Amino acid sequence: GTFDRVMRGLRLLQKHGVEYNLLTTVNRINADYPLEVYRFLSDEAGTEWIQLIPIVERLDSDGLGLRLEGTDVSDRSVRPEQFGRFMTTIFDEWVRNDVGTVYVQTFEAAVRNWLGMSSGMCVFNENCGNALAVEHNGDEYSGDHYVEPKYQLGNIADTQMVELLGSDRQRQFGRDKSETLTKQCLRCEVRFACHGECPKSRFAVSDDGEPGQHYLCAGWYEFFTHIDRPVKAMVALREAGRPASDVMAIMRAEMPDVVTLASKAPRNSPCPCGSGLKTKHCHGATSTSDPPEPTTYPVFVAEPRRRVRESQ
């Protein structure tokens, strides 16, 4: 079937060292299975680069999704809270096991925003408009989600792309992303990370009753507030000259069963938290007779290791 053919093609790319990433859409069905989706992509498919794109299809009065109109969504569109749970669950798996070996575009963008850099994704930048969509016939549009007649800027055969990017019309399109935020967005604690997401899905109503709130606002808010502390830890590690992957040991140490596992582990074995220290010098230390080992190296050693999956 199609699945088998796709997997054969993927193995062929891997065999010849061809770089690729997997773009996975998140819909109302697979959003209920975050770990199954993530572990398939990272473990079974063996990919290192993952994009997770939420499906949000607006329906107009005719029940069609041909234009950016209407406030109803299709049955396959992911629900806001469902999407938030999906993303936070995958992040928790990633931040404990796969930092530095699996790259999830949304997570990378979040870290960049916490560092005060450009996220690298137009949806999470303050303004947009720097990435035109070009169709097969050369028609150019304001953005990938705006391939509609009223957003057509011209044709590449008639006008240089740089001219269209710098046009007053396109520049205003980009500024509209920040200039049309709702009051709820403007006072939001994670606005610096979200920036209202893509305007094409701002068709919901804010808590204040103001139109123009992003449909997935509740999900994104859950995600960005959830990752705040571990991402701040990654930023602190980076600023201290240590690899961001050291955060995995920090997060594993907070797993409820770490202390229990450490109490049962041989005292000279590596601590179950993944720090690289002996158990007796980490979570298995029971008295002052077991002083910490000298820390002339980073406490949390970021050596390649097999992924440690939490039991479900």
Annotate each language-model stretch with its function.
Residues 2-4, 11, 15-123, 127, ...:
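Radical SAM enzyme [4Fe-4S]-AdoMet core and its adjacent flexible, acidic
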Residues 142-144, 181-201, 219, 270-284:
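Local cysteine-cluster metal-coordination motifs and their immediate loop/turn environment
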Residues 147-191:
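Membrane-interface junctions of multi-pass transporters
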Residues 170-177, 182-185, 201-206, 255-262, ...:
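Short, intrinsically disordered, charge-biased short linear motifs at domain edges
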Residues 205-229, 290-311:
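Short microdomains enriched in Cys/His and/or Lys/Arg
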Residues 215-257:
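Charge-rich, low-complexity terminal tails
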Residues 242-312:
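Acidic/negatively charged segments and metal-coordination signatures
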